[in-house]
Amino acid sequence: MVSNIPFSIPEHSLDRDCTTLSRHVLQQLQSFSSDAQDLSAIMSRIALAGKLIARRLSKAGLMADVLGFTGETNVQGESVKKMDVFANEVFISVFKQSGLVCRLASEEMDKPYYIPENCPIGRYTLLYDPIDGSSNVDINLNVGSIFAIRQQEDNDLDGEARDLLQNGRKQIAAGYILYGPSTILVYSIGRGVHAFVLDPSLGEFILAQENIIIPDHGPIYSTNEGNFWQWDEAIRDYTRYVHRHDGYTARYSGALVGDIHRILMQGGVFLYPGTVKNPQGKLRLIYETAPLAFLIEQAGGKASDGVTNLLDIVPDKLHYRTPLVIGSVEDVKLVESFIADRRHRDRV
């Protein structure tokens, strides 16, 4: 177990014994079979995508096609930001002709993007949200990318990607990249959760924290209380509870990755419940909530839709949505207890 202190890398270590992301992944893979060694190269490509996106974001306001909307809507019916398009294309570009992945599936695309020349040898699928919280770009707040890796289980000759419609325990790796004051990559391949900070002078992600453990309980509750009257009564009951009791503080940035990173480091709970308008929630299971659930569970936390463990949910379509309750074990259980209690009272 490690204490979740702020990231700090001694200056002298950068010259001598720093651990880069690629080196760390290779060390993690020593206990894996030889078939899994491609994960190191895949993680390096994800890191490259993160570097390219971070560079673009650093020039927001100084160059065209970074801020604002494209005027189009995506498969979710949402207005598309210019950075959404750029980031999605970056992920596709860095994996083309890599021989590593056969498919890329993104919340920005109706169907997976196939790379035929990779398919004979690329045994993996990359699932990702290229830019989470893209509305924050125009006001210079943090945004992020979310990713997960799954092993392809059939030839998918009809292009329907049915093998992706399985629970989140089929993920073999997951993580996120947070673009803020520094660019941070957090990942897990099922051997703990590890964080890396991008050193711009080296162009490398450097290990900052290893084997991160989320506190069992934390002071943070993170949710958009502007939706209060659209929530189920159980979630309103929970919100009233934290308002009445000392020791809780609200933090919400509008970027899922930023809020989850705070919860991971400081403890607490993030909630994105269903609403009257969207009872199934807004967040996508295979691109957002399942990858984050994989990561948080690896850190000793808990994630559910309020009733069912998120990693046990089987979607019936690629863009399946789900509510999200995620964070410290005690805090997630508290939210779940309000939901269970309300359901019990409704049945009586």
Curated annotation (Swiss-Prot):
EC number: 3.1.3.11
Subcellular location field: Cytoplasm
HAMAP family associated with the record: FBPase_class1 (MF_01855)
Cofactor(s) the record lists: Mg(2+)
Binding note for cofactor: Binds 2 magnesium ions per subunit.
Transmembrane segments: none
Quaternary context: Homotetramer.
Name used for this protein in its record: Fructose-1,6-bisphosphatase class 1
One GO term describing the cellular component: cytosol
Binding site for Mg(2+) 2: 129, 132, 288
Residues holding substrate: 132-135, 224, 252, 282
Residues binding Mg(2+) 1, per UniProt: 107, 129, 131
PANTHER family (UniProt xref): FRUCTOSE-1,6-BISPHOSPHATASE-RELATED (PTHR11556), SEDOHEPTULOSE-1,7-BISPHOSPHATASE, CHLOROPLASTIC (PTHR11556:SF35)
InterPro entries reported in the protein's UniProt record: FBPase_C_dom, FBPase_class-1, FBPase_N, FBPtase, Fructose_bisphosphatase_AS
GO molecular function (one): fructose 1,6-bisphosphate 1-phosphatase activity
One GO BP: fructose 6-phosphate metabolic process
Family: Belongs to the FBPase class 1 family.
Catalytic reactions on record: beta-D-fructose 1,6-bisphosphate + H2O = beta-D-fructose 6-phosphate + phosphate
Alphabetical list of Gene3D superfamilies matching this protein: 3.40.190.80, Fructose-1,6-Bisphosphatase, subunit A, domain 1
Pathway membership, UniProt: Carbohydrate biosynthesis; Calvin cycle
Organism field: Microcystis aeruginosa (strain NIES-843 / IAM M-2473)
Domain of life: Bacteria
Swiss-Prot/TrEMBL keywords: Calvin cycle, Carbohydrate metabolism, Cytoplasm, Hydrolase, Magnesium, Metal-binding
